[in-house]
Amino acid sequence: MSAPMSASTSVVTRFAPSPTGFLHVGNLRTALFNFLIAKKAGGEFILRLDDTDPERSTQAFADAIQEDMEWLGLTWDRIERQSDRFDRYAAAADELRAKNRFYEAWETPTELDLKRKKQLNMHQPPVYDRAALALTDDQKEALRAERGQGVWRFKLDHQRIEWTDGILGDLSIDAASVSDPVLIRADGQVLYTIASVVDDTDMGVTHVVRGSDHVTNTATQIQIMEALGKSAPSFAHHSLLTGPQGEALSKRLGTLALRDLREAGMEPMALLSHMARIGSSQPVELAGSVEELAEGFDLNHFGSAPTKFDVEDLWPLTASVLHGTAFEDVAGEIAALGVPADIAPAFWEVARANIGKRAEIADWWALFRDGATPLVADEDREFVAQAFAMLPDLPYDETTWSNWTSAVKEATGRKGKGLFMPLRKAVTGRERGPEMADVMRLMQVKPTL
C-alpha cells in the first residue's frame, strides 16, 4: 500500500513529459504540483524525458520542454532520459520473466476487438482473457513463425490493489477488472508503464503526482513494483482540466501551449499562481515568487471534481504582475527601447499602471516619442484645432496640462468632461490612460492634428 504524502528532506519528485509535442496547461499542472512539493520539502525535482518512442520523440520538442520550464522558473535538479536506460528496462523484463509474471501474446488488434465485443454482449467486463497463457510451446513457436514476436504482458495478481491517494483518499481497485497490461510491444518498444516503474524505483522517487486518468495505471504499476521487490512511492491524482463551461479541454490544448501563452504576453508568475490554486479550496492570489507559492502549497486543499480552466482569467493576473514590477526589473527593457535615462523611471511609473502585457510598454514609449494619431469626433474638431493652436512648444513639465487646459477653458468656455476628454483623445489617441499631467511631461514631440 502506498503511504500518504508527508514533507521530508528526502522527498524526490519528477515531471516526465514525452518530447512528442509542446507542453500545454494540462502538463503544467502536473509539473507544477511535483515541483512545489519538492521545493517545499527541500527535496529533489527531476525532469525526466520519456522518449522511448523513437518515431515521435524529437530533440526539438525536448529543447522546447526545457525552454518552457526555464521560462516559468521551474528549475530541475537533474535531467534524465529514458532513451539512455533501455538496459535497465530489459533487466526488469528478464526479472519478471524469471518470476513467471511476464508472458508473450500474439492476438491481433482485430482479434482483441472481437473478444471485447463478445464480452460486452455477455455483460462481462472487457478484460483480456489470458488466452496466451494456455498456449503450448509448439503453439507459441507456430505463432512466432507466422506473426513474428508478440507483445509482452504483465500477469496481474487478481486481488484488490489498495493505496492511500494524496488527493483522492483511500482507493481500491480489483485487479481482476483490469487487463494484464502490455509492457513491451511486438516491435520491441518499451512502454510507459514499465519504464516509469523502473525509473521511479531506480531514481528514488518518493512522491508521484499526476492526472486522475492515471489511476488504473497506478494500480498496475504498484503490482509491477512489488513483483520487482520494490516499494511504491506515494501517489496523488489531481483532477483533469475542463473548459470554462465544463467542456472537454483536450481539443483546445493545442491552442493552450505554454509557448503560445508566452508569445501572447502571459507573465510566468500569473500563470503559476493561477495553476497552483484552481481546483483547490484556496482563492487564486498572485504570488511574488515560486518560493512563496511552494510555502502555501498543500495537496489537502484539492478535491476530485474536474477543474475549470479559462485562459481569460490569466490576463488580469498578468496585468497585476506588471503593475507591481519595480523599475529595476525592467530598466534593461526600457533602455533598449531608447527611453532616455533621465526620464526612464518616470516613464515606467506612468506606463506600468496602464499596460496589460509587457509588449505594451513599447506602445506607450512610441506615443511619447512620436506622438499619437489623434482621436477626434466631428463635433469636437473645431474646438480641438483651437486648443492645439494654444499649445506651447516643448519642453513640457508637470504644470503644462493644467496651464494649457485653463487657457483653453477661458478661451472656449468649455469645462469638465467636455473640455478634458476631447483633448485627452486628441493628444493620446485613447479614451483612457495616465494622468494627463504625467503624459504631457513625458512627451518628446509637440502633439499635432
From Swiss-Prot:
Keywords: Aminoacyl-tRNA synthetase, ATP-binding, Cytoplasm, Ligase, Nucleotide-binding, Protein biosynthesis
GO molecular function, one term: ATP binding
Ligase found in the keyword field: yes
Localization per Swiss-Prot or TrEMBL: Cytoplasm
Record bears the keyword DNA repair: no
Motif ('HIGH' region): 17-27
Motif ('KMSKS' region): 248-252
Pfam families in UniProt: Anticodon_2, tRNA-synt_1c
GO biological processes: glutamyl-tRNA aminoacylation
Enzyme class label: ligase
EC number per UniProt: 6.1.1.17
One cellular component (GO) term of this entry: cytoplasm
Coiled-coil blocks: none
Catalytic reaction annotation: tRNA(Glu) + L-glutamate + ATP = L-glutamyl-tRNA(Glu) + AMP + diphosphate
Binding site for ATP: 251
Source organism superkingdom: Bacteria
Function: Catalyzes the attachment of glutamate to tRNA(Glu) in a two-step reaction: glutamate is first activated by ATP to form Glu-AMP and then transferred to the acceptor end of tRNA(Glu).
Family that this chain belongs to: Belongs to the class-I aminoacyl-tRNA synthetase family. Glutamate--tRNA ligase type 1 subfamily.
NCBIfam families: gltX_bact
Subunit record text: Monomer.
Name of the protein in its database record: Glutamate--tRNA ligase 2
Species of origin: Jannaschia sp. (strain CCS1)
Highest classification ranks of the organism: Bacteria, Pseudomonadati, Pseudomonadota, Alphaproteobacteria, Rhodobacterales
Name of the gene: gltX2
